[in-house]
Regions:
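Acidic-and-aromatic substrate-binding clefts and catalytic sites of carbohydrate-active enzymes
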Residues: 37-42, 60-72, 93-102, 124-133, ...
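Active-site-adjacent pocket scaffolds in enzyme catalytic domains
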Residues: 110-114, 118-227
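Short, well-ordered coil/turn segments that N-cap beta-strands
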Residues: 2-6, 55-59, 80-84, 116-121, ...
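Active-site beta->alpha N-cap acidic-glycine motif
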Residues: 1-84, 254-255, 261
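Active-site beta-loop-alpha junctions enriched in small/polar residues
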Residues: 11-15, 64-66, 90-92, 125-128, ...
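Conserved, mostly hydrophobic/aromatic
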Residues: 11, 52, 88, 123, ...
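C-terminal domain-boundary segment and adjacent tail
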Residues: 205-283
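Generic structural signal for well-ordered alpha-helices
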Residues: 45-49, 72-76, 102-109, 135, ...
């Protein structure tokens, strides 16, 4: 494996997040918020695809089933241009119960297969948390990896299940599964820095240069100090697709490509390589 691996990932929430995770309990969807999601599909995603094509990069897109059903043409373009599509819930459900998740999974798999032509092997939880019942469902359905946790920054590891906690004793770690974890970080995500919201109030007008330095310094440290590091960036078409941010992403790509021993990969590729290098005794 080269010295540094870059994984660009895009959470293609589109309208779905404004119907669930960011609905703020409204009785009906906000037309303004819906239009923000629509921008991601109509404008942001095509800009990103054009940028990736310009630099010959194949990325990973985590697509809710709702996005695939609502915007099939752009989702088919994502697949047609060689990008990986991962599972991201159906309507960006942040905290489903086990019985709800079973239906969500079925709906999402049906929608994604229509645009991707095959079942996804990767998952990012919309609520960025993992319950044991979710892990079990992923394992039962042959998933290769998850990218929702933050237990490392530049190294892959195995997802655990069966952790136990108490306020009267130490935290007890469960057992490792065969599911590979490709860690995520809020510091390498565009949503917290740039997504304005009235309710709950989020200012989110962070200076572009400030976030660029976050992302660049993460890369520079990894490339200089970490052997075989994996840098995973999480962005959203309705955010990173804005004019002032798509140019920032291009600046970052240019900076990374100037370094020696750097490659861009899909998440499924690095997970497969990790499995080969660290085989599971009892898969």
């Amino acid at each position: 494996m080269p010295t540094s691996t870059i994984c660009l990932s895009f959470d293609f929430d589109a309208i779905s997040a404004w119907l669930t995770s960011w609905s703020s309990g409204r009785s009906r969807p906000s037309a303004v918020d819906i239009s923000r999601g629509e921008f991601g599909a109509r404008v942001g995603a095509p800009r990103i695809l054009d940028l990736l094509k310009k630099y010959d990069i194949e990325a990973t897109w985590f697509v809710p089933g709702h996005t695939a059903d609502t915007f099939p043409d752009i989702c088919k373009r994502v697949s047609r241009e060689g990008h990986e599509i991962g599972y991201h819930g159906y309507a960006h459900e942040a905290d489903p119960r086990p019985e709800e998740e079973a239906e969500i999974f079925k709906l999402a798999m049906t929608a994604l297969k229509k645009v991707y032509g095959r079942d996804p092997v990767g998952y990012r939880f919309p609520g960025l948390d993992l319950a044991d019942f979710t892990i079990d469902r992923l394992l039962e359905n042959g998933f290769l990896y998850d990218s929702s946790l933050m237990g490392d920054d530049f190294h892959l590891y195995r997802v655990r299940r069966g952790d136990q906690w108490s306020l009267k004793g130490p935290y007890k770690f469960g057992s490792e599964t065969r599911l590979v974890e490709i860690p995520f970080s809020w510091y390498l995500d565009d949503w917290p820095a740039f997504t304005f919201s009235w309710d709950p109030f989020r200012y989110a007008f962070t200076a572009v240069d400030t976030v660029y330095q976050y992302w660049k310094r993460h890369f520079d440290y990894m490339h200089e100090c970490i052997e075989d590091g994996v840098y995973t960036l999480c962005t959203h078409p309705q955010v990173i697709g804005r004019a002032h941010l798509i140019t920032m992403l291009e600046d970052l790509i240019r900076h990374m490509k100037k370094a020696n021993g750097v490659r861009f990969c899909q998440l499924q590729e690095v997970a497969t390589e990790y499995n080969k290098a660290h085989p599971v005794a009892n898969p």
